[in-house]
């Protein structure tokens, strides 16, 4: 509602409004600026087009200012047709309390909009407004909207960066990227990876652990300790009728047992594990199976200090790949 960029833009908005009026739109509010007044102000303007299907100008002419045009629609499908008629839009807003209607509108109108805001009672109080630039969202639209993704939001940064594909063997790619990738060579030595300091550990340093055979007693003990008495672990008859055919080991026990195989006890440079990514249980492990763990350093990075105290210890962040295999040579848990 504030001033436009300059008087030339104000003149351009006035000319666009005049064209819309000439095409058959009715002025409900505003419509004419005082071109002799100081400042590039244009009055809030509301137009009404009673025949939107027969008035192509209302879809083709964009008065880039505080101007809006009301258009009636017969039903939902007609509303979608009108929403797409502009041939590309930076942003659109749908005001509705119906999730079903919102889904239908998104699926039908998304291809013609860079962004669609769904406004209802829950979101209205914190609404950023129609088309406000936000770093997490695309800022730009298709077709006649002219693109613009390179002008706003986090995605815009990538438009100013070159993407180059690098092709080579896994070991070569790991060397170039300073990050171990699956299939690359590993380095096994007599020093446990957890005993190495930041300067010593390298991507690709790996440990293949001893083996451990899992028993029904392990399943029962873990169930009693954790409280997880799920039938696939504890009910022999019900488990036999499942897709597994028999009882299976708890997935979370496998993770714990794996830690018992690869962790090096005692005071070491490694201090804690703060999470696991891409954990998948892709094969069942059953009583009598023997597991073995492969631990590989993927990459290492220096962790920024939270304290300005020069005496604060330096921390580093290591990313590791774990793969649990069974005696049947299945990779049952990669993460």
From Swiss-Prot:
GO MF, one example: oxidoreductase activity, acting on the aldehyde or oxo group of donors, NAD or NADP as acceptor
Record Pfam families: Aldedh, MaoC_dehydratas
Coiled coil feature spans: none
Compositionally biased region (Gly residues): 140-151
InterPro entries for the chain: Ald_DH/histidinol_DH, Ald_DH_C, Aldehyde_DH_dom, HotDog_dom_sf, MaoC-like_dom
Residues covered by region (Disordered): 123-152
Occurrences of domain MaoC-like (ranges): 203-306
Family: Belongs to the aldehyde dehydrogenase family.
Protein name: Protein MaoC
Organism: Klebsiella aerogenes
